[in-house]
């Protein structure tokens, strides 16, 4: 089922990107490396995390940005005050579908899981060091990388596995 999502790319003052490795206990895409934070805006939250067509058309997407702040705290322990909504930049939306090949015991047999998302791409450069305290139920590891380090990590010879949305975003942008 098509649903909304967001992907956060958090950069430090040196333009390094914060990556996370998803926890091995995650139902979908366990242990894969990906961008800083990925999740979904939730209906029923106040203030709202669901954007109106007007918000989307004008590029404001305040709901997706509020959801991103919520999940940066939940997944990575980054305090809300360190990633204010006003610092987020909305780049675009990406529609994609991906089957999770490793969802069942991380075997190639795969499982019934996957994603069909309209993914809002959000960049943030807070301008101050951020506090990171990963939630072990969500995150296995984190790493700050520059462009060259990211390229080396994404090289197939590295043996690292990547989330499909992150690979698509890196290929397209």
Task: Outline where the language-model segments fall.
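Nudix hydrolase/Nudix homology domain
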Residues: 37, 43, 89-173
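Poly-acidic low-complexity segments
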Residues: 63, 84, 134-135
């Amino acid at each position: 089922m098509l649903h909304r999502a967001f992907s956060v790319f958090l950069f430090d003052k040196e333009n390094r990107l914060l990556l996370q490795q998803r926890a091995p206990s995650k139902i979908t895409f366990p242990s894969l490396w990906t961008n800083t934070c990925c999740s979904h805006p939730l209906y029923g939250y106040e203030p709202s995390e669901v954007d109106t067509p007007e918000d989307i058309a004008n590029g404001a997407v305040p709901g997706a940005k509020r959801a991103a702040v919520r999940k940066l705290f939940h997944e990575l322990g980054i305090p809300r005050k360190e990633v204010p909504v006003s610092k987020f930049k909305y780049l675009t939306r990406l529609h994609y579908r991906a089957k999770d090949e490793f969802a069942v015991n991380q075997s190639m047999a795969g499982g019934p899981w996957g994603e069909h998302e309209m993914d809002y791409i959000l960049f943030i450069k807070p301008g101050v060091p951020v506090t990171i305290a990963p939630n072990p139920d969500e995150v296995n590891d984190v790493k700050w990388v520059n462009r060259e380090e990211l390229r080396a990590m994404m090289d197939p010879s590295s043996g690292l596995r990547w989330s499909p949305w992150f690979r698509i975003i890196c290929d397209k942008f």
